[in-house]
Amino acid sequence: PNPRLEEFDGKPAPFKLPNLERTPPGKIRKSPFTFRRYGESGIDVSEMFPHVARHVDDLCVIRSMVADNINHNGACLQMNTGEQTFSRPSMGSWLLYGLGTENQNLPGFVVVAPNQPAQGAPLWDSSFLPAAYQGTCVTDLKQPITNLANSSLDANSQRRQLDLLARLNRFHRNQSVSVDELDARIASFELAFRMQSAAPEAFDLSGESKITQELYGIDDTVTQTFGEQCLLARRLVERGVRVVQLYHNRSSTASGCQIWDQHSNLKMGLTNNCAASDQPIAGLLTDLK
């Protein structure tokens, strides 16, 4: 909570604001939600996150971060890469590059986003790092990796096909100045072949017990979507995937893709979003411990 908001609640801003012709500035408002301290750390948590509050001592809360860009694309890019205009490696790419992965049959960096957020793929891009370190985006948990299996070829035929493609790509690479994308393409073909057996099992949530699914809120329509994402994150991490990044943006409408970007009805919007994400996050923290 910001004590200055309490101090200036209902008053004009105590500093000069830019002249806005279309939208005149309103008065300062304090948060409509109450906060109280939790855990041995005494960290303030909003009443909207009662489940997460019980895990506050397991969290690293950083309140010193700032952003320089108020626009969707630039702000999202800065949050993920540290840069708001130029291409830079994403945080997930840096982690994968520095720490490697423990599973050679699944991507080392997986992004789960029912709908792509503002800016899209650059948020998990590897930029000047080798292309193999970019994230793999999953939008549909029921069909996580599109075109993964080739129903017209058996495994032996696919293996011969991949070997031929690899030879052709290596030949082309030897004639090319830029080899990074070709190396990544060769590696992606090999990974896709191995994923045909590993991915279906990893992404199948049906084998999880009823108790586990209830822990994540999958039995409740309010928390089901993000609960499934959080449960998938646990399954991927325990199988050696180094980085899993989740986006809470379940709607397919233009305004719904950025459901945390409320321009109006703030109290209702935040209440709905917190209700949909609180229990799944707490369930993941409980399960990881």
Residues of each region from the PLM?
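Ligand-binding pockets and gating/stacking loops
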Residues: 1-289
